[in-house]
Amino acid sequence: MSYLSNFQINHDELKFDIHHLNCSLVNAIRRIIISDVPTLGFRTENGRESDIIIEKNTSFIHNEFLAHRLSLIPIHYDHKKLESYDKKRFEFFIDITNNTTKPLDVTTEHIQIRDLSKEPPVILSKSETSKFFKPNPITKDYILINRLKSSKTGLSGDGEVLKLKMYADVSIGKEHARYSPSCVSAFNNKRDLDKIKIKWKNLFLFLVHAL
């Protein structure tokens, strides 16, 4: 007997039907999707070594708030390779100075990745990096991280600076919401048209016999 059917995948949304299962089991599946599916994230917690190292930040956002914001950025990675993922292989970094006369929005598009498994280490191409941090499928925008104020003089070295490095780790949503691969996971009952027809038919026959 098949319990799952009618899978529909549309951009970042997955829908499917569940048959012949109690609601308690369906709810358990929903909770597993939220809290027990492993994914990548940047860990940063008080009292433990942080995976986010901020080397220089002259923007108006203080380091703790910035680290928290970075930790909630979703990282796309092949789920089949998660078990063998090496935390020390990839170094994610941002090194940017706003030397323009306009404010600069720093987004996930500015994150670069250094492959430390190579000798010497190499920086991944923009196309390879975009596989980790994908733009919104509708707006094509990247996630905003920070905004650097413009240079007062327009001279090099006068603008705000953001320099940091990060290391991604594998975990699950039970530890922290940053490791949850699903922002929404819900279920609802569907109308069983076959059973409805049978009910109406039985009701009709009952009324006919009653007359």
Predicted regions and their residues:
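Protein-protein interaction/assembly regions in multi-subunit complexes
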Residues: M1-L211
